[in-house]
Amino acid sequence: MVQKSNYLLLLLIFVSACANKTFDNTEEITEYIKEEENNYCYKKNIEGIEYILQYKPTDLLVEQELNDKTDQKKIEQLRDKYKKYMYFNLSMSLNNQELLSNVARDKSKFGQMVNDLAFGMEEKVNLFTPKNDTLAMADFIYPRMYGMTNNTSIMIVYPRDKNYLKEDYIYFTVEDLGFYTGEVKFKIKTLEIVNEPQLRFN
């Protein structure tokens, strides 16, 4: 009887761990994914550069495009549209400034970095499995802020390939952008992506 009770308890814990957490608003879900212990946000400091890699759940993109939160059909349409991809925000800062501000006096470095950030991130960033199977980047968005923010922020988009998410984790790497950091590697747990948090729209 005790053994059966223990089994049921373990089963309940497992099911709870695999369930999608649901939040009432964007503030709650944003705070949740910011906490490193929840495995959606990863931070590293290399050679003074603060790297923050954060997964962006599907429903945050749905919410940005949704006008009527009671329109269930529209909600499902937008979820179908966005859940085909995985979205990562990569933030980098040095001396509490965006990266370009730190090379503004060197025209050669400045020009190369502008080119890398605006056009070359598919060559600078990689996502791959422990078996070194690399997933091709679908898109990236770099909004140049002209020194108006204290970090360089890029949204990087990958196809949501189920074969890659069968692994326990995947690697996300950023090549050296000219600050002698070497390759910066993040180990991302896939279970949290599969069971990403959701918003309660109505």
Range-by-range predicted roles:
Residues C18-N202:
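Conserved functional micro-motifs across diverse proteins
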